[in-house]
Amino acid sequence: MNSIKFPVLDRTTKNSVISTTLNDLSNWSRLSSLWPFLYGTSCCFIEFASLIGSRFDFDRYGLVPRSSPRQADLILTAGTVTMKMAPSLVRLYEQMPEPKYVIAMGACTITGGMFSTDSYSTVRGVDKLIPVDVYLPGCPPKPEAVIDAITKLRKKIAREIYTDRIRPQQGNRCFTTNHKFFVVRSTHTGNSDQQLLYPPPSTSEISTETFFKYKSPVSSHELVN
């Protein structure tokens, strides 16, 4: 897993001097020391916990689990995300330093799973809240699949240009620390009828009344940023 090759790093002179760029050196240092923040809400998280044991021993891949998002550069979401938990998840993501990455683990995290059918309180895909780098399907995915997802993420980091990643996030922000929840009419068809709106971060705010008080009864909620 540590044998990811860099074309620029492989070029050496006769005096064994490595010729590289600052961007490639930064990518090389980050891909071998990912610090994940674990956000597990359901059974998929138990499969990730298996990696901690001696059979898989994910420490040999440079993974150091952190309990604070401010010390992590990778968040791994596993399990169902509800409307009530959505602001907390986005707030945790915003607290992570750049550059940061997301792995969506399991069917419930990627699409809402079986809990999203005729459910008014389930987010149908965590990518409606935060940008996802690697999708890991399964119900639940095996520990070997988690290692494969981390390997693919490492390869992505190896080819990454930092400025190209930051610029789209700053220009097209689809997530903010503050959120708005609106109550709208919805049909229970099993399809994803949740939509995303992208207001400026300065105009978004969390209102307590939005969470607990509603002017008229409705059948479901819809999440918008």
UniProtKB/Swiss-Prot annotation:
Its EC number is 7.1.1.-. InterPro entries: NADH_UbQ_OxRdtase-like_20kDa, NADH_UQ_OxRdtase_20Kd_su. This is NAD(P)H-quinone oxidoreductase subunit K, chloroplastic. NDH shuttles electrons from NAD(P)H:plastoquinone, via FMN and iron-sulfur (Fe-S) centers, to quinones in the photosynthetic chain and possibly in a chloroplast respiratory chain. The immediate electron acceptor for the enzyme in this species is believed to be plastoquinone. Couples the redox reaction to proton translocation, and thus conserves the redox energy in a proton gradient. [4Fe-4S] cluster binds at C43, C44, C108, C139. It catalyses: a plastoquinone + NADH + (n+1) H(+)(in) = a plastoquinol + NAD(+) + n H(+)(out); a plastoquinone + NADPH + (n+1) H(+)(in) = a plastoquinol + NADP(+) + n H(+)(out). One of its GO terms (biological process) is electron transport coupled proton transport. HAMAP family: NDH1_NuoB (MF_01356). The keyword Metal-binding applies. GO terms for molecular function: 4 iron, 4 sulfur cluster binding; iron ion binding; NADH dehydrogenase (ubiquinone) activity; quinone binding.
